[in-house]
From Swiss-Prot:
Alphabetical list of Gene3D superfamilies matching this protein: 3.30.420.40
Organism: Staphylococcus carnosus (strain TM300)
Protein's UniProt keywords contain rRNA-binding: no
Keywords carried by this UniProt record: Acyltransferase, Cytoplasm, Iron, Metal-binding, Transferase, tRNA processing
Name listed for the protein in its UniProt record: tRNA N6-adenosine threonylcarbamoyltransferase
Top enzyme category: transferase
Protein encoded by which gene: tsaD
Length: 343
């Protein structure tokens, strides 16, 4: 009988300090998350310097809590996995330096993990991958379609050419007077409104799987500006509904088209915006109509957390991916560089 593999994972790419212990890539023994939302709310967004300071304050206790909750020790851990990027450099370095210190002190392998690979592998913690598959990544910093023919095989077939979908949500939220984080509040308002504003659906070229949300964002802002100039009433619920319907229609349409083009039967959704109820609802409908298996993680695994880093880190560890003590953080990082081709 083979020995269980225990991965200690650390995530600090943005405004959550998180540590987790993952068993055999599938079982969450602990997943401690220290959120900074309240600290950033008054600024209307994440302030990098504030985020870094909070990571410094919380990283040690977060790791200790993860180990204690998992009822394990560093001696029993097989490897330390940590987010290398993309993310805020100052924030990333707090987690990376903690991981390097532990790996050095306890003579454990150090495994660098791509943040988006982590989001993708959050799905595998709840429902096994069925290859080949298509991954739709929707978050504050990323909007991508990634084709996977096997574990650690990442081919980006589409990505945003300007704003990520989460950025558009936050900007629209601020425009209609909602506080940070805006995405969940827009989603909640959208359930109460009607689609009364004609906002654009940006499909780009016929065969393109790329996305663009800057035009939609500008259309919403301009529409509200014009209404104010004319002293006409603005109904926030209807703005939220019209905006969200425009976003969701494009995301769902391109995801389904990608699945059909690449002949895959499982669509997984990853990233913070994957917890959006409107998006989840429309994806369920579309996937049922096209006989595609849909996999979306629980909301707690959609937002940044270390369990997802441990899930991806397990397969990277098994594939022999390692880093030395020169590991650094990167604000931008190509997920395709983390692909492992099987012989």
């Amino acid at each position: 009988m083979s020995k269980d593999t225990l991965i200690l994972a650390i995530e600090s790419s943005c405004d959550e300090t998180s540590a987790s212990v993952i068993k055999n890539g599938k079982e969450i023994l602990s997943n401690t998350v220290l959120s900074q939302i309240e600290s950033h709310k008054r600024f209307g967004g994440v302030v990098p310097e504030v985020a870094s300071r909070h990571h410094v304050e919380g990283i040690t206790t977060t790791i200790e809590e993860a180990l204690n909750t998992a009822d394990t020790s560093m001696e029993e851990i097989d490897a330390v996995a940590v987010t290398e990027g993309p993310g805020l450099i100052g924030a990333l370095l707090i987690g990376i330096n903690a991981a390097k210190a532990l790996a050095f002190a306890y003579d454990k392998p150090l495994v660098p993990v791509h943040h988006i690979a982590g989001h993708i592998y959050a799905n595998n913690l709840e429902e096994p991958f069925e290859f080949p598959l298509m991954a739709l990544i929707v978050s504050g910093g990323h909007t991508e379609l990634v084709y996977m023919k096997d574990h650690l095989s990442f081919e980006v077939i589409g990505e945003t050419r300007d704003d990520a979908v989460g950025e558009a949500y936050d900007k629209v939220a601020r425009t209609i007077g909602l506080s940070y984080p805006g995405g969940p509040q827009v989603d909640k308002l959208a359930a109460e409104g009607e689609d009364t504003y004609d906002f654009p659906r940006v499909w780009l070229e016929q065969d393109s799987f790329d996305f663009s949300f800057s035009g939609l964002k500008s259309a919403v802002i301009n529409k509200l500006h014009n209404l104010k100039q004319k002293n006409e009433a603005i109904i926030p619920e209807n703005v939220a509904t019209s905006f969200q319907n425009s976003v969701v229609e494009v995301l769902v349409g391109k995801a389904i088209k990608a699945c059909e083009t690449y002949n895959v039967h499982q669509l997984i959704v990853a990233g913070g915006v994957a917890s959006n109820k409107g998006l989840r609802q429309e994806l369920k409908k579309a996937c049922a109509e096209h006989d595609i298996k849909l996999s979306i993680p629980s909301p707690k695994l959609c937002t940044d957390n270390a369990a997802m880093i441990g899930a991806a880190g397990h397969y990277m560890y098994e594939a022999g991916m390692r880093s030395d003590m020169h590991l650094n953080g990167h604000s931008s990082l190509d997920i395709e560089d983390f692909s492992v081709e099987k012989e």
